[in-house]
């Protein structure tokens, strides 16, 4: 009965427009109050909500959000775009390849898909359209390339997943780096094919060693950040939380004193914006912790594990089923909400089937990113629409070849665990 109350209540509250975090908390409280078989007190929900945030790893989320906002406003994105363009040279579709590479570089700084779309799109979209690139294809490529944001570390969704499952944040970031490089290669290959098929323009800027070195030097402060973050974590010198705090300090130094495009007067609004974004994410995590605890306490998790195990599904088939479920939920729910709702339900089953926690984490992470590109809840498309001023339908039409490449690589990751684990 508790499970019916929880999921029916959660679905009903979402339908009538109640925020996700409140829906999780209210449905959990209602199940405790209405199911006579649940003997714990209602105030246990408050204890579990507090326990959901009582972790130093959770602090990394707020710091990474703040660091991403500081970098977006601090002039780093322009240096990243110039550096990416200096690498490509005058090939057909060169600016489109530049966009993909710029999104990959910026992803290693921000960890956010919408931030990547806005930061890179603001700089490159108008210039590409003036050069003769199709508006819909350019916007669509921006949407899908922005999906590198939560995959290439640092990644907020990976920190959330690691907190829920006990996985190593460092190992998640290593796997994410490998997956991110793979997706980048796939997108570049798709760009090359369509650049020749649709006769996209050649970049007028040819590769020049002097220009490359100048742009590289200008980009060093930006490129240093992922080295500091990932190097500190991989070497064991820093935890993810400590690295995220250092990322904030370095972002301030780069924006205020090196690039000088960030001003002290900007900081208050950046702090407020970051606090709001972090609070929404943390509230969802907190209430989902209580939801997941009651799910296990009522014995629903154990019953579900036994049911699936008795179906004799292979690990690959289960991973494929999970991928489809996550993609469906991601269409209607924001990415982190999908993860915090389903991971506590699905991970015990995956664990019973012997699925690697990092591989499962990559499935969850990539599926959540795909959700940012699929209407109606498609934050990447909304972000691209705000930059490009194009209608959503035109952006969706333009993104299909890149979206197919992204999703195709996702299913390869689902079925081939070594793609997730080769860097570990």
Located regions from the model:
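Alpha-helical transmembrane segments of multi-pass membrane transport proteins
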Residues: 1-424
